[in-house]
Structure formats: structure tokens, C-alpha cells
């Protein structure tokens, strides 16, 4: 039994190899592209909408509401990035119902890449919200001696984000393999249902943690935020 999709090699030439992580990552992206085109090709602003558009609106509005609850600010600037993370991870895990499929989130390289996306998104959103000087000043809080610790804290959060998702998905794969060897007829059905639920939960937690990190970097004084809002609406 392969613990990670990196161990499943389909083709290798010298130092270059084509493993299950790459194959199934492209599969997930392909499903997302085709699914997005299929659902959005006939979008309508009327009250009579298709089931696909209705499902899409439920997902988008649900993600936006969750972001809104976390940051207590307009969620639209963060919705594309956080929504993409959630949908990609959730779909990667949900496709596990397909025989032979191995979730790319079970590879440390995939979870590290996702965590790096969050790592670079944090300062981008922070600078956009607070400016370069305002963003860099937070590393000197509460006093300049905390600078190295604040920097280490940023790196440690990203490492924890990558390892946490990888560990949960890999451990799920190991448990399924053990139960299949013990009772191959009864436990697979239960584990499939539990695996689907766990996959969505892991995607939700990853997206929430990413949003928390971004919100911490782009947090502005609430009084200033309210004043700016009043000026823009006044």
C-alpha cells in the first residue's frame, strides 16, 4: 500500500518522473475548469435559474459569509483566493470515491505548495490594506526585539498549515488500508462516507486558517475602517 501518491510512479525517465500526485492534480484542475465552464455558461440574473447556478450561488455565498464573519469587513477582495483554496482541496478529497484515485492533498509537496500560496498572499493582502510601511511595522510590535520571533512565527504557521493537511489526509489513507485488510466488505462503505465528510472539513479548516492569517496581516483599526466607510457612503 502506498502511503502518498508520490510513491505511485506511472512513468520515469532519468531524474524526471510522472507520479500520481501530478496526474491527479491535473485531473482535479481539469474537473474544475470543465465544471466551471459548464455551470457558468448560461448564468442568468432572473429568478428562474438552473440547478447548477443555484448550487454555485450557494457555495459562493456560503464562503463569502464565512469570510465576513471572520474579518468583519467586506469579503469580496478575499473571496476568489479563499474560495479557490476551499474548492480545490474539497474536490481533491471528495474524488476519493473513484476507485484508483489518490488525493493529491495526501502529498506533502501539494500541501506545501498550497501553504506557500497562503504565505505569499498574506503580505500581498497586508500591503494592499495597510501599505508597505504599515505592514512592516507590525513585525516590530509590541517592541522591536520581537522582530525575529514575529518572522519565525510567520514561517511556523505556514509549515503547520502544510503538515496538518498532509498528516490528516495521509492518516485517513492508512486507516482505510488497515480496515480493508480486516473487514473488506463492511468497513469500506463506512469509511467512504466518513472520508467524504472529513475531506470537506479539512478543506474548510485550511481555508479558515488561511483567512485568519490574512486577516491578521491586513487588520486595520476598526475606527478608521468605519470612518472610511462613512466617507465613501457619505
From Swiss-Prot:
Q: Name one GO biological process term.
A: proton motive force-driven plasma membrane ATP synthesis
Please give the PANTHER family that the UniProt record associates with this protein: ATP SYNTHASE SUBUNIT A, CHLOROPLASTIC
Question: Which Pfam families does the annotation name?
Answer: ATP-synt_A (PF00119)
CDD domains given in the database record = ATP-synt_Fo_a_6
Q: What is this protein called?
A: ATP synthase subunit a 2
Decide whether keyword Transmembrane helix is in the record: yes
The task this protein performs is described as: Key component of the proton channel; it plays a direct role in the translocation of protons across the membrane.
Which InterPro entries does the record associate with it? Alt_ATP_synth_F0_Asu (IPR017692), ATP_syn_F0_a_bact/chloroplast (IPR045082), ATP_synth_F0_asu (IPR000568), ATP_synth_F0_asu_AS (IPR023011), F0_ATP_A_sf (IPR035908)
Location(s), subcellular: Cellular thylakoid membrane
Which GO terms of the molecular function aspect are on file?
proton-transporting ATP synthase activity, rotational mechanism
Question: According to its record, how does it sit in the membrane?
Answer: Multi-pass membrane protein
Identify its protein family. Answer: Belongs to the ATPase A chain family.
Q: Describe its partners and assembly state.
A: F-type ATPases have 2 components, CF(1) - the catalytic core - and CF(0) - the membrane proton channel. CF(1) has five subunits: alpha(3), beta(3), gamma(1), delta(1), epsilon(1). CF(0) has four main subunits: a, b, b' and c.
* Keyword Thylakoid attached: yes
Keyword terms: ATP synthesis, CF(0), Hydrogen ion transport, Ion transport, Membrane, Plasmid, Thylakoid, Transmembrane, Transmembrane helix, Transport
Q: Which Gene3D superfamilies match?
A: ATP synthase, F0 complex, subunit A (1.20.120.220)
| Superkingdom, taxonomy of origin | Bacteria
Query: What cellular component terms from Gene Ontology apply here?
Result: plasma membrane-derived thylakoid membrane; proton-transporting ATP synthase complex
Primary location: membrane
Which residue ranges run through the membrane? Answer: 20-40, 78-98, 107-127, 169-189, 194-214
Amino acid at each position: 500500500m502506498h502511503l502518498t501518491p508520490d510513491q505511485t510512479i506511472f512513468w520515469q525517465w532519468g531524474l524526471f518522473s510522472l507520479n500520481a500526485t501530478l496526474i491527479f492534480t491535473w485531473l482535479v484542475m481539469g474537473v474544475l475548469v470543465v465544471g466551471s465552464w459548464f455551470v457558468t455558461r448560461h448564468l442568468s440574473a432572473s429568478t428562474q435559474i438552473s440547478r447548477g447556478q443555484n448550487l454555485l450561488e450557494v457555495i459562493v455565498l456560503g464562503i463569502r459569509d464565512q469570510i465576513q464573519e471572520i474579518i468583519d469587513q467586506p469579503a469580496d477582495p478575499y473571496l476568489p483566493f479563499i474560495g479557490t483554496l476551499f474548492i480545490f482541496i474539497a474536490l481533491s478529497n471528495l474524488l476519493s470515491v473513484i476507485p484508483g484515485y489518490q488525493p493529491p492533498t495526501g502529498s506533502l509537496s501539494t500541501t506545501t505548495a498550497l501553504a506557500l500560496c497562503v504565505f505569499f498572499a498574506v503580505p500581498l493582502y497586508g500591503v494592499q490594506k495597510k501599505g508597505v510601511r504599515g505592514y512592516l511595522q507590525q513585525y516590530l510590535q509590541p517592541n522591536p526585539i520581537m522582530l525575529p520571533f514575529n518572522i519565525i512565527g510567520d514561517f511556523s504557521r505556514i509549515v503547520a498549515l502544510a503538515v496538518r493537511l498532509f498528516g490528516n489526509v495521509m492518516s485517513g489513507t492508512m486507516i482505510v488500508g488497515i480496515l480493508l485488510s480486516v473487514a473488506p466488505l463492511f468497513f469500506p462503505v463506512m469509511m467512504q462516507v466518513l472520508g467524504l465528510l472529513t475531506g470537506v472539513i479539512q478543506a474548510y479548516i485550511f481555508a479558515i486558517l488561511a483567512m485568519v492569517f490574512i486577516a491578521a496581516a491586513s487588520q486595520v483599526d476598526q475606527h478608521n475602517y468605519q470612518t472610511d466607510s462613512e466617507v465613501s457612503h457619505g
